[in-house]
Amino acid sequence: MKISYNRLWKLLIDKGMRKGELRDSAGISQSTMAKLAKNQNVNTDILVRICSALDCTLDQIVELTPDYEE
C-alpha cells in the first residue's frame, strides 16, 4: 500500500492554514513536514497530533492506495 497526504494539503487549504502554522500548532519538525510532502511514512503519534491540531480524523488527512506490482 502507498500512503498519500494529499487530503491533508487539501484540508489545510480549506481551513486557510499555512504549513508553518500546522507545524507550530502540531509541534512537528520541518523534516517531518518534508516527509509528509514526499508522501513518506511518519510516526502515528505525529498523525494524531496533526488530527488534534486540525480537529479532524485520520481518514481526513491520509489516503492508502494499492501498490500494484507487475
Predicted regions: what is each one?
Residues 2, 11, 35, 62-70:
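Short, charged recognition helix plus adjacent turn
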Residues 12, 23, 51:
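The alpha-helix within a helix-turn-helix
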Residues 9, 20, 34, 48, ...:
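Residues within the helices of the helix-turn-helix
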Residues 40-52, 68:
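Short, basic-rich loop-to-helix N-cap that marks the start of a DNA-contacting helix
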Residues 1-20:
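A short, Lys/Arg-rich alpha-helix, primarily the initiator
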Residues 16-34:
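Short alpha-helical DNA-recognition segment
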